[in-house]
């Protein structure tokens, strides 16, 4: 009788240990699947560019093509970087149109700036469809890197359905001449209720993917930038830039500057 009880106890102990091992194995598999899902989300991230407006005459310019001197010295380099001033925005390959959408009243515009504040300063210009311009001046950082220029909340907000043209010019401090410039277009879109509901329930990584899949570039880039700031191991920033051919800038540091000051 005692032997039977011992056998039952042994059987129960083995069953209990087996259950624990299966539970741990299952948990490990789920964790691995979640990890793979996050990695797959970034690797398969797709930016679905909206149809380009048919009535734009000048396509814009995403990157500065050449190098211009400062203060009359055409051979003086302003930076040791080999990269040029570049707007971190999509460009349509067939038309070379620089155009992207936002849902924000006051979006942020991101640029790679290879110049330092020792030599140069910046000017950001926003022009509406009636060609009314708002001109902002900004200082630059002390070193090359990615800068974010956010429209100040005291300015007139972007209107839904309206298209705006923007210019970002870099001036030489010595002679106040433009040494580099980029330009493009932005249109503010209405955020539909279905997407808004999805975004409210989404994780930070999923928000990047949702914005990108719906062609909302500026918010996708801002969400990816925030992930990069809070988690240096996250790959959303690099993956998003790669979708529009800007992977060369994925590892460039973000530099803290710059405030836009209205000149009007």
Q: Model features per residue range: what roles?
A:
Residues 2-16:
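Bacterial N-terminal signal peptides that target proteins for export
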Residues 109-111, 146-174, 178-180, 184:
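Extracytoplasmic/surface-exposed domains of secreted proteins
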Residues 96-112, 117:
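Contiguous beta-strand segments within globular domains
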Residues 236-264:
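Preference for solvent-exposed, low-hydrophobicity sequence contexts
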Residues 41-57, 61-71, 76, 94, ...:
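Extended, polar beta-sheet/loop recognition surfaces of beta-rich domains
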Residues 19-29:
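C-terminal segment of classical bacterial N-terminal signal peptides
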Residues 114-124, 128-130:
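Solvent-exposed loop/turn segments flanking beta-strands in beta-repeat/beta-sandwich domains
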Residues 133-145:
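Solvent-exposed serine/threonine-rich low-complexity stretches and specific carbohydrate-binding patches
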């Amino acid at each position: 009788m005692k032997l039977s009880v011992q056998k039952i106890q042994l059987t129960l102990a083995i069953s209990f240990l087996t259950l624990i091992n299966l539970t741990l194995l299952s948990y490990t598999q789920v964790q691995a699947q979640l990890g793979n899902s996050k990695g797959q989300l970034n690797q398969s991230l797709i930016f679905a560019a909206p149809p380009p407006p048919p009535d734009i005459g000048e396509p814009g310019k995403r990157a500065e093509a050449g190098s211009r001197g400062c203060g009359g010295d055409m051979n003086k380099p302003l930076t040791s970087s080999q990269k040029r001033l570049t707007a971190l925005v999509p460009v349509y390959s067939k038309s070379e149109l620089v155009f992207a959408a936002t849902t924000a009243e006051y979006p942020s515009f991101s640029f790679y700036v290879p110049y330092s504040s020792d030599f140069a300063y910046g000017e950001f210009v926003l022009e509406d469809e009636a060609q009314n311009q708002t001109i902002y001046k900004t200082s630059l950082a002390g070193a090359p890197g990615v800068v974010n220029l956010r429209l100040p909340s005291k300015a007139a907000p972007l209107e839904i359905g309206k298209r705006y043209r923007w210019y970002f010019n870099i001036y030489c401090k010595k002679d106040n001449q433009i040494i580099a410039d980029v330009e493009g277009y932005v249109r503010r879109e209405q955020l539909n209720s279905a997407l808004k509901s999805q975004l409210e329930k989404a994780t930070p990584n999923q928000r990047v993917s949702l914005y990108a899949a719906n062609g909302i570039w500026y918010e996708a880039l801002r969400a990816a930038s925030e992930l990069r700031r809070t988690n240096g191991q996250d790959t959303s920033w690099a993956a998003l830039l790669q979708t529009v051919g800007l992977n060369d800038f994925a590892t460039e540091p973000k530099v803290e500057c710059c405030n836009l000051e209205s000149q009007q």
